[in-house]
Amino acid sequence: YEQQQLLNELLAEEYQKNIVKNDRTFNLQHFANYSSVKQRALLRLWLQDWGIALPSLVQLEQIISDVIFAKFDAQPQFRLDDNIVRRYQNRLFLTPMFTDISQEYVEAKFNHPISLPDHLGTLLLKKTTEKMIALWQDENGNTHKETLALPLEGTKVWIRFRYSGKVKLTPNGVNKDIKKVWQQLNVAPWQRQRIPLIFYDDKLQSAVGFFTVFQN
């Protein structure tokens, strides 16, 4: 135990250099330059910071080979208890295990908080005489706002979590594949299906807090 403590103290400064403060992700830029002993020790420190029970040597080595050093264009992940270790844009993320909500449809009510699936918070849709305002309070307590045109009389308003296809974001913009839009907005792949999407009937209008689609 004392040896472990001493090792942690010796590595503390190096460790802090690699941690992205705002989201506690691990920057992997210099990881390949470290010895395998140091790699495992830094990874252990990071998991410890998240309050994760210390993984076995085999698990640490699997995370290093299968996640950290996975192919550049892969979306690698490794399960540790109820958490997933993921890599995106050369950073290591730890997330809970998410439920697949890509097929969920929630019919919208106005002026009444709507509970979103899988602990994603609440969405409030407010109508004014000219606009509709969407306010999403996410699971971390952050509020995201989007202003939309009012739906036409008789239009069903839906909240969904998956869309594949093209979107146009400005009057003079081109139709872009939504995957490209998410990439430009730096939204990680696993987060893309956890953002409330507002549809009027079957037409995507908005990803709340991220963009509103320009309708011709």
Locate the predicted segments by residue.
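AMP-forming adenylation/ATP pyrophosphatase catalytic core
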Residues: 1-216
